[in-house]
């Protein structure tokens, strides 16, 4: 009986070892593909907020980590720098609207360094379906209204919903959500105006992590 038990134990051990080996090989083979797909998806998102024709650098390779209250939280946010012939011309900045109706709204804001917004996309939110979710480009084109708009200083009153004297449509039954996004985009564009002199001092993405 002991011989039989040993045989079963050996079989199980061999099976476990072979399964582990197969899993390791599969992971090794699929990891590059998954990583490549993630990079492609990231590039597609970046292209939606910073048009590719504006720069000739590899925007994905120039990524920095920034922290600033203007970005909506104390957490680190990433910023991707776009350069034309070596000169920084625009950036895609991760930002947070902390005051959404159902919690924080994560954004990717593209802008030049003179206050012009190039594009905005929502990357994560928990807003109410049918109301606040109109910030998603797959549901509404509302988020594209930011394209090409200028932020003319911190006190630019146009950056508000129309019912508060601004130039942006609010949603029927939902004002908090668009207000939160508008304010976050405005703060992000203003922050990016201050960024160029700091670029050489920023920590690259992946450093000290």
Curated annotation (Swiss-Prot):
Organism domain of life: Bacteria
Family statement: Belongs to the RnfG family.
Family matches, as InterPro entries: FMN-bd, Ion_transpt_RnfG/RsxG
Protein name as annotated: Ion-translocating oxidoreductase complex subunit G
Leading EC class: translocase
Gene: rnfG
Subunit structure as annotated in this protein's UniProt entry: The complex is composed of six subunits: RnfA, RnfB, RnfC, RnfD, RnfE and RnfG.
Pfam families: FMN_bind (PF04205)
Membrane topology: Single-pass membrane protein
Record keywords: Cell inner membrane, Cell membrane, Electron transport, Flavoprotein, FMN, Membrane, Phosphoprotein, Translocase, Transmembrane, Transmembrane helix, Transport
GO CC terms: plasma membrane
Organism: Pectobacterium atrosepticum (strain SCRI 1043 / ATCC BAA-672) (Erwinia carotovora subsp. atroseptica)
EC nos: 7.-.-.-
Functional summary from the UniProt entry: Part of a membrane-bound complex that couples electron transfer with translocation of ions across the membrane.
One GO process term, biological-process aspect: electron transport chain
Transmembrane feature ranges: 9-29
Modified sites of kind FMN phosphoryl threonine: 175
